[in-house]
């Protein structure tokens, strides 16, 4: 026999899950108190980072039903929601979202809804990649360097090159500049083959 669970999440400590519990009960779902999982955590946290949700996942079995009042209870964004619903569906768990009319997200109508959500998730991901790429291009155009700051500045690199030309050992130069031999060898290589 299938069991019914509810997941109620609130973001701040001054909120309660009472409204969500009432909404679930008003929709006709009778859920045992021990099968209502409540969590006080930010909605920006992915479901994988939610301890209460992870405890719920460990308890759910094939044939069980999960009730949420809103879709955002299942993830922090469209991609996370899609991943969560897919994970639950693969396990054989039916997911009902009351904000979508109590629709079972694993039913044909629910699957269509999830395809729309998947399209939105893909669109979100593409926008994020596009913004990231344009931000990197803009930063590089403004002369922004990426990665760690160089160990040696240009003046120090010239001194290193002069020391190498005068026969000082790589190890001695590395000790003088308090850096590794590899850093000195990289500086030497760059000065011998300047950027074209």
Swiss-Prot record:
Coiled coil: none annotated. The active site is at residue 11. One of its GO terms (biological process) is DNA integration. Its EC number is 3.1.22.-, 6.5.1.-. It comes from the Bacteria. Keywords: DNA integration, DNA invertase, DNA recombination, DNA-binding, Hydrolase, Ligase. The keyword Ligase applies. InterPro entries: Homeodomain-like_sf (IPR009057), Recombinase_CS (IPR006118), Resolv_N (IPR006119), Resolvase-like_N_sf (IPR036162), Resolvase_HTH_dom (IPR006120), SSR_resolvase (IPR050639). GO terms for molecular function: DNA binding; DNA strand exchange activity; hydrolase activity; ligase activity. The keyword DNA-binding applies. Belongs to the site-specific recombinase resolvase family. This is Serine recombinase PinR. It comes from Escherichia coli (strain K12). The gene is pinR.
